[in-house]
Amino acid sequence: GNITVGGTGKTPTAQYLAASIRDMGYRVVILNRGYRAKWRGDVGIVSDGQKLYMDATEAGDEAFMLAKHLPEVPVLIGAERSLTGQYAIEHFGAEVAILDDGYQHWQLARDMDILLVDAVNVFGNGYMLPRGTLREPVSHIERADVCLLTKVDQAVGVSREHIKNTIRKYNEKALIMESIHQPRRFVDLKDWHRDISGEGVDI
């Protein structure tokens, strides 16, 4: 998750982690809250890892994208991820559960907190919502086990070391990593939600 509103790359990171852990031989599931989903209920199955059961309108675009691009990885939606997590264990034999945007989700215990920090807009203007973009104080970096700096190739006006020093000010133990975001293809917007083949125009 992150401590600011807006896109830091949480969903692509969840996708990458899920694929990597799946390829290690673990049974992994993704638990997504279903942002902007029309579906309402306790546990929604977007995909069982073999078949899609919802479209982007029902599941929300983030959950649908994950389900579309992650074969063999069930994707569940629901506001209470303690419920979706329990369902994943009981029905899919989940060994690893990844929460997409779960840094503020206290109802489910976790073994690791991965905090994403946008190198382009590090901590906004330093103020909490609604005055600023912070979901919680910067000092809450202390909870993270891993801090992933995203979009480091796009950062202008702030050095990576400055960001890392801010992180270390509140958390000396967290592993700090860096990532870049690179688009891979264009998809026609009017058809993207119906396409499950991953086809597009390569960049």
Segments predicted by a language model, with ranges:
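Walker A (P-loop) phosphate-binding motif
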Residues: 1-50, 154, 200-202
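Phosphate/Mg2+-binding loops and adjacent switch elements
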Residues: 35-178, 185
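Short, charged low-complexity intrinsically disordered segments located at boundaries
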Residues: 3-9, 96-97, 119, 193-199
